[in-house]
């Protein structure tokens, strides 16, 4: 399945709504001000674009998945903000050098295969006195653990593959964006009425899990259930756990 189509399967907006607080946190840490030109790279359904636009910034939201941009447009309209939604590749941004005061990405840039190229593009379009602010799940956190477990049962990745959660390590970000980077760790709380119900919801809604289920069948479901039971902090039959992410501001 083509990656841009994969993200359009299921109901990603329902998943994105659960991590909306991370977009708000990222926008706050980016110190966006009215009138600034802001680019949200791999904007998804607009979790960071819309909060930035609410601050009276001039926001461009870019993503390679048309289905996600359709949802983002609806979200922006419902929120009564103006965002320029553009289909495009994080590894080949369709903008001139030094076009933006802020370049942000909330869990989107991390999925671009070539980390160096993605970082170079973000730096290229950011103004010399601007800032790049990104959020990524940490590899040692509970979402990072999900990526590890599913990766362990999946076919070997192509040569040179870089795990998305490398963006959640300080050393890797410094290698990509330079030494002048500030880091903060935050958490998103994930909740469900039950482990089984949450697993069903995610496997039906989250594009990467849908694709993995098609490829791995019951092994994916069994592995995901085991993971959820291991990370669950609730003792009342429900599901509750905290996913750690790293905010990097350069």
Label the predicted regions.
Residues 31-33, 54, 113, 127, ...:
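Short conserved AdoMet
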Residues 91-102:
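A short acidic, Gly/Pro-enriched loop at the edge of an enzyme's catalytic core
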Residues 37-41, 45-92, 117:
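Class I SAM-dependent methyltransferase SAM/SAH-binding core
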Residues 102-115:
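A short SAM/SAH-binding and catalytic strip from SAM-dependent methyltransferases
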Residues 1-36, 47, 51, 71, ...:
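Conserved class I S-adenosyl-L-methionine
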Residues 116-117, 123, 127-193, 209-213:
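Conserved catalytic/acceptor-binding region of the Class I
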Residues 18-19, 45-47, 166-176, 180-250:
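Conserved Class I S-adenosyl-L-methionine
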């Amino acid at each position: 399945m083509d990656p841009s189509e994969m993200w359009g399967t299921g109901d990603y907006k329902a998943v994105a709504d659960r991590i909306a607080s991370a977009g708000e946190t990222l926008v706050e840490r980016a110190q966006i001000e009215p009138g600034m030109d802001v680019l949200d790279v791999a904007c998804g359904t607009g979790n960071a674009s819309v909060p930035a636009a609410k601050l009276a910034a001039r926001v461009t939201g870019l993503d390679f998945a048309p289905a996600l941009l359709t949802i983002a447009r609806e979200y922006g309209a419902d929120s009564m903000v103006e965002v320029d939604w553009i289909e495009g590749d994080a590894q080949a941004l369709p903008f001139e050098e030094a076009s933006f005061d802020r370049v942000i990405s909330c869990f989107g840039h991390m999925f671009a295969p070539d980390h160096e190229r993605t970082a170079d593009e973000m730096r290229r379009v950011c103004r010399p006195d601007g800032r790049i602010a990104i959020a990524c799940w940490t590899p040692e956190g509970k979402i990072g653990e999900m990526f590890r477990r599913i990766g362990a049962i999946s076919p070997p990745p192509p040569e040179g593959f870089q795990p998305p959660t490398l963006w959640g390590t300080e050393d890797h970000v410094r290698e990509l964006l330079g030494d002048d980077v500030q880091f903060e760790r935050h958490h998103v709380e994930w909740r469900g009425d039950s482990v089984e119900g949450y697993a069903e919801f995610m496997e039906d809604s989250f594009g990467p899990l849908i694709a993995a289920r098609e490829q791995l069948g019951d092994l994916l479901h069994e592995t995901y259930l085991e993971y959820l039971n291991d990370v669950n902090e609730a003792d009342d039959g429900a599901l509750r756990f905290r996913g750690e992410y790293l905010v990097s501001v350069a």
